[in-house]
Amino acid sequence: PNYQVNPIDVQGLYEAEKSLFGISINGTTLIPCEYFAQNHCTIGDFFAGIFYLCWVPVPIAFGLWLYWKGERKVYLRFAMFFPLVNLIGFAGYYIHPAAPPWYAMNYGFEPVLDTPGNVAGLGRFDELLGCSIFHSIYGRNANVFAAVPSLHAAYMVVALAYAAMGHCKKWLIALFAFIMVGIWCTAVYSGHHYLIDVLLGIFCALLGIFAFEKGLMKWGAFKRFFERYSKYIR
């Protein structure tokens, strides 16, 4: 587990969020997640659930669509990049183990290693539809101290970037941008991520894209492998 490598950050991240993005109400400063825990609405809860359900299926569907459309080079770059962004994310989890905002809001600042996963604000979506979609996902979370960076924030950045690089239809690029921003907002609205986590997730995606496109794809040996493999899967 990452918390055996480095100490868990619970209070530091919370205080940084409050300092950078705090919302003052009646003389009290709340982090955005606390504000939305107290100020939410049915339509917001519904769309939050819809957006969060998109974070993995939409990139997967996009990759399959690229393959079926015969855009094999864009597909291959997109498919090869995902392990890299995940590696960057997992490196972040081990470099800086961190609790999500719902942990600080519900349990305080002392890390308890056997804390179960928590559906947080996404539970309102389950209640609204009378289902247990997010309870089944987050109730099985084995390690809650892996909030930084937010890969939820990163994945749609990657999908949007490769949709743009692949010269996809403008409506698809606009749709991906809409879903991407919706996921960013939901991460905070639901209490699953700080704004800091989201920004770091975006940074990881952009860093990974730069490293892959301007580094690996320019390296002769890798480029030759890529060209041979892209011809093989045509």
Where do the protein language model's features map onto the residues?
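N-terminal transmembrane-helix/juxtamembrane module of multi-pass inner/ER membrane proteins
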Residues: 1-59, 233
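Alpha-helical transmembrane segments of multipass membrane proteins
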Residues: 85-93, 183, 204-212
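Membrane-proximal cytoplasmic C-terminal regulatory module of class A 7TM GPCRs
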Residues: 211-234
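Membrane-interface loop-to-helix entry segments
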Residues: 43-58, 143-165, 195, 199
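Membrane-interfacial alpha-helical segments at the cytosolic side of multi-pass membrane proteins
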Residues: 61-68, 153-170, 203-214
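Membrane-interfacial catalytic/cofactor-binding modules of polytopic membrane enzymes
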Residues: 95-166
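Interfacial segments of alpha-helical transmembrane regions
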Residues: 60-96, 102-112, 176
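Interfacial helix-loop-helix junctions of multi-pass membrane proteins
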Residues: 100-104, 147, 182-208
